[in-house]
A protein has these predicted regions:
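Mg2+-dependent phosphoryl-transfer enzymes with acidic/Ser/Thr/Gly-rich catalytic loops
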Residues: 72, 79-169
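Short, structured coil/loop segments at alpha-helix boundaries
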Residues: 3-6, 43, 47, 118-126
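Conserved acidic, metal-coordinating active-site core of Asp-based
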Residues: 13-111
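Glycine/small-residue-rich loop that forms an oxyanion/phosphate-binding "nest" at active or ligand-binding sites
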Residues: 1-14
Length: 169
């Protein structure tokens, strides 16, 4: 199973909360948090002490968009997890396209998936993927950027998205 190795490495959110309780400027995000702890923070809160705490718990710290801080099991990221899932499902990775907008998504592009940085992406992500031929930088944000990339990479053939338009019944 894909999740078991991640679960085995996860120290638990309570250990992380206890270890960083004394650090000012961290606010827990109100998002689902299985095998990760997510916080809002200011850039100054990301210190070597914070990184050392994460390392002592066998975790990585990921800071993105000048606002988001995630504690994840060491070596676990979107790219590695997606690769494991694709292998588990026996899919062809060339049939997969990834999309992102912050540095939290960088690992997917580092695993050499076809991908899109949607419009309004974080500058750091755009810079980190600029030289990757398999990553398209879209103009439109969100779903619009994904549609741009589907067309750019030819996922729907020569006619593209227009072939998918259906007549009203």
């Amino acid at each position: 199973e894909v999740q078991s190795p991640i679960e085995d490495m996860w120290p638990g959110e309570h250990k992380i909360e206890e270890a960083i309780a004394h650090i000012a400027g961290l606010t827990r995000q109100d998002v689902p948090q299985e095998r990760r702890c997510s916080y809002f923070c200011e850039e100054g809160a990301v210190t070597s002490e914070l990184s050392d705490i994460a390392a002592s718990l066998n975790c990585d710290v990921l800071y993105s968009a000048g606002l988001y801080l995630d504690f994840l099991p060491k070596g676990i990221n979107k790219g590695a997890t997606l690769t494991a899932l694709i292998n588990h499902l026996e899919l062809n990775s060339e049939d997969v396209m990834v999309a992102g907008d912050t540095l939290n998504d960088l690992s997917m592009y580092e695993h050499d998936f076809i991908g899109v940085c949607v419009g309004e992406s974080e500058a750091g992500l755009l810079e980190a993927t600029r030289s990757r031929a398999r990553v398209y930088h879209a103009l439109e944000p969100g779903c619009g950027g994904i549609l741009e990339a589907i067309s750019h990479f030819g996922f729907l053939g020569e006619e593209g998205i227009s072939a998918e338009v259906r007549e009203p019944a």
